[in-house]
Amino acid sequence: MTPEIIAAIKQRIKDFTYIQDVRVFNDQFTKMLADGNPFGYNIASPAALIEFSPSSIEQLGNGVQIYNPIQVTIHIGQMELDGNDALMDEAISIFELRNQVYLAMQEFSTEQMARMYRVSENPDYNHGNWYVYQIVFETSITDHLMQRPKGYTEASPTLTTTGSYQ
């Protein structure tokens, strides 16, 4: 994954939602709630974590490769103790965040990334007072890191032999 793609997705979420804590996913919600928070995670609420699933990589030619398809999961988390509706265990504001992220990311693209399309979504349970929701998008991403310059050709080694063969 390229740093430019990660930065573009992070910025898109920040620009089109009220989520400002946007990071690369490292199972922070689970680790933060581990006994005594041994990993030291401190996440602002609401938060969005970006996860790139493993993908097959194809060679396009001239050094360019493509991740096709690749799934990008946005883990949306919000700490909520009470939804102000007298129902302690029913905080529905996570769905407002889900809608914001969906509207921001559906059909989002960059020069290296094809349009993103939502393919699934689901709640993620067992995170204490954190409500977590996942939206999975699918896209294709080209990697130009090893792209050869236009007109590039491999140099053939020049071999010079001396002596004779009998």
Where on the chain are the PLM-derived regions?
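Short histidine-centered catalytic/ligand-binding loop motif
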Residues: 81-94
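A short, hydrophobic secondary-structure junction motif
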Residues: 51-54, 76-80, 97-108, 166
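Short, charged, solvent-exposed linker or helix-capping segments at domain edges/interfaces
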Residues: 85-86, 146-155
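Active-site-adjacent structural patch at catalytic or cofactor/ligand-binding sites
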Residues: 51-83
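One-face residue pattern on beta-strands with alternating periodicity enriched for small/polar residues
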Residues: 12, 71-73, 134
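Acidic-leaning, charged glycine-interspersed low-complexity segments
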Residues: 20, 42-48, 91-148
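Small/polar-rich, solvent-exposed N-terminal microdomains that initiate assembly or binding
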Residues: 1-64, 151-166
